[in-house]
A protein has these predicted regions:
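Catalytic metal-binding core of the metallo-beta-lactamase
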Residues: 1-105
């Protein structure tokens, strides 16, 4: 018989608000614009956010990026959180060299 981990279930049910994602994009954009790598920016955000669900997802994104995925590909792996429109804008920014601008557009 499995024991339910209620804290894990509660965490999965916690939503990530649009405002929280906007802060995520702004934080990453500011750091990338300042010359910080995506990995360092993701790590910085996960250290600073109070949203435990978003922190968990950013740690997952960090692992995908660390293994070689571009940010857009890492986000595609979390479709319940990041929609196609967001990902398309980020992917265009990666391809054009304007990622920091695409994160806040």
């Amino acid at each position: 018989m499995a024991i339910l981990d209620l804290s894990a279930i509660a965490l999965r049910l916690t939503t990530i608000k649009t405002q929280d994602k906007a802060l995520f994009y702004e934080h990453i954009s500011n750091l990338v614009e300042g010359g910080v790598t995506i990995l360092e920016a993701l790590s910085s955000f996960s250290d600073k956010t109070d949203n435990l669900r978003l922190k968990q997802e950013v740690l997952t994104i960090t692992e995908f990026v660390r293994s070689g995925d571009p940010l857009s590909t890492a986000l595609k792996k979390l479709p319940r959180i990041f929609d196609r429109g967001e990902i398309a804008v980020i992917e265009a920014g990666e391809q054009s060299g304007t990622l920091q601008r695409s994160l806040v557009s």
